[in-house]
Amino acid sequence: MTNPIRVLHVLGGVGLGGAESRIMDLYRQMDRDEIQFDFLVHAAAVDQRKPEFYDEEIQALGGHIYVLPKFRVYNYFSYRRAVQDFFAAHREFRVVQGHMTSTAGIYLPIAKRAGVPVTVAHARNAGVVKGPKGLATKFFRRGLAKKADRCFACSTLAGEDVFGKAAMEAGEVKIIHNAIDVGRFTFDEKMRGEMRAQLGLSGYLVLGHVGRFEYQKNHPYLLDVFAAVCKERSDAALLLLGDGADRPAMEEKCKELGIADKVRFLGNRKDAERYYQAMDLFLLPSFFEGLPGVLVEAQAAGLKCIVSDTVTKEAQATDLVTYLSIEGAAEVWAQEILKQANYVRRDTAGELKAAGFDVSSQAEGYRRFYLG
């Protein structure tokens, strides 16, 4: 096919986040002579947007990145005009897939009126932040299931949160679990030894977490848990992959807890799979999640995982996951970590694939959908 059909993904940005990573996993699987992805992102100042984590790869794969002004509620009318102007100028998209559901009720109907054949609202998360921003998100999501041609959700929990239980019960929402490149994360004993030696952590109890430094991920509780572990195990270390606005505050909290020398702030990594190999246990004490891809990645790496009981059970592809409340003392998590610290790591690739979490098999379904 000389002119591939073009699919536009609408997101807040293309930094290293869960939805972004899953879309890129899918993008790499596409025959780009047949299907091309483009991205519509948001920035505070359109002409001053800084390159993000996936910019370079998107452009290398043949995709385009377009920018809208960030939605602030007070700029509702100017935001609508910007969306209208964009779709008036861009008639090339066969599918517009909105992963940023907070304003999908605005941009998807506009895209449809502009002639886009298929619009999709895709729920990628469950729960919203507290305060005015969360209230605004809930307001603009009202009736979203009726404003898109198709509705997808990464889990039942995410679907109910974004589209409502009535839409779910009516069968208006298709559940498509967040799939990963399983082979990339499969347990590798040799790589594990190399990474632990490289990090100077051979013989240590290495705990790990991957996620943006923001409210949802509950880093303060995570650090309290690790501090409790350190009281029992002087050989404990914590690897934190990710970046975000709350990182400086968490670095300061480490100093206050006396654990700064045991915590590694590693930032955004293109080789996250190597760090999973170095870990002994994976921790995810989030306040809310849709279906966390990082939990799927950790299971693919054969890691025992201790996660918040707010995380959907649909993310449990193996018997490696333990759910705990984040309402109680951090010491409860610490004791569970110590109890599970010694186990035999195994190859779980077959289990992940059997559970439908491998992107290579999921890609064919998307291909058929995009081509219509």
In which residue ranges do the predicted regions lie?
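Aromatic "clamp/platform" in nucleotide-sugar-dependent glycosyltransferases that forms part
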Residues: 268, 287
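A short, active-site helix/loop in glycosyltransferases that binds the activated sugar's phosphate group
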Residues: 148-186
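Nucleotide-activated donor-binding/catalytic signature segment of Leloir-type glycosyltransferases, i.e.
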Residues: 251-267
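A short helix/loop element that forms part of the nucleotide-sugar donor recognition site in Leloir-type
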Residues: 83, 186-200
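A conserved mid-protein helix/loop that constitutes part of the nucleotide-sugar donor-binding site
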Residues: 20-25, 205, 209-228, 245-252
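N-terminal strand-loop element at the rim of the active site
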Residues: 3-5, 9-78, 86, 172, ...
